[in-house]
Regions:
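Acidic, metal-coordinating catalytic segment for phosphate/diphosphate chemistry
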Residues: 1-22, 28, 92
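Sequence/structural signature of beta-propeller domains
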Residues: 14, 76-81
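Conserved Nudix-box catalytic region and its N-terminal flanking loop in Nudix hydrolases
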Residues: 28-74
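Nudix hydrolase/Nudix homology domain
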Residues: 42-43, 109-152
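Short arginine-rich
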Residues: 71-76, 142-144
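Active-site-adjacent beta-strand/loop module that shapes the phosphate/pyrophosphate-binding cleft
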Residues: 82-113, 123
């Protein structure tokens, strides 16, 4: 899979929101979710990124999972749109308001080398651990809650 950089092919909707594809990457048994470290600030996030004009949304989700987390996935469910609920002070030119489309996915392979390995760690979390780790990102928490992950 080819890694991409830049936003020259980035999609935006009629409201000016950046269209972002993301995944809730789970183990086959649905007991663990893989989170990655944010590059913008401290904390954990789900793999996600811009949906580009020359790809389908599912392709963007698969590409972002590879680039950011080094995983090969199988998309299982479309979790639908998730509204960006970040307050205006957390938005910027580099992080504009977004409309997220999340997919539940099964992780098939974790690669040892991937495009963003040098700037991100990845870690498996239980549902309760992930809820705590994503507590300051309501849009990511909503995606997790829409998934079929076991709530134990």
């Amino acid at each position: 899979m080819e890694s991409r950089t830049g936003r020259n092919k980035q999609r935006y909707n009629s409201k000016g929101e950046r269209l972002v594809a993301g995944v809730v990457p789970l183990t086959e048994d649905r007991l663990y979710v893989l989170l990655i470290q944010s590059t913008r600030r401290k904390g954990w996030v789900l793999p996600k990124g811009g949906w580009e004009s020359d790809e389908e949304c599912t392709e963007a989700a698969e590409r972002e999972a590879w680039e950011e987390a080094g995983i090969i996935i199988r998309i299982d469910y479309d979790l639908g749109d998730v509204i960006d609920s970040r307050p205006p002070k957390r938005l910027s030119k580099d992080a504009p308001k977004a409309l997220y489309r999340f997919y539940e996915a099964t992780v098939l392979t974790e690669e040892n080398n991937w495009p963003e390995k040098h700037k991100r760690e990845r870690q498996w979390f239980t549902y309760s651990q992930a809820k705590e780790a994503l507590s300051d990102r309501p849009e990511l928490l909503q995606a997790l809650e829409l998934s079929t992950m076991h709530r134990s």
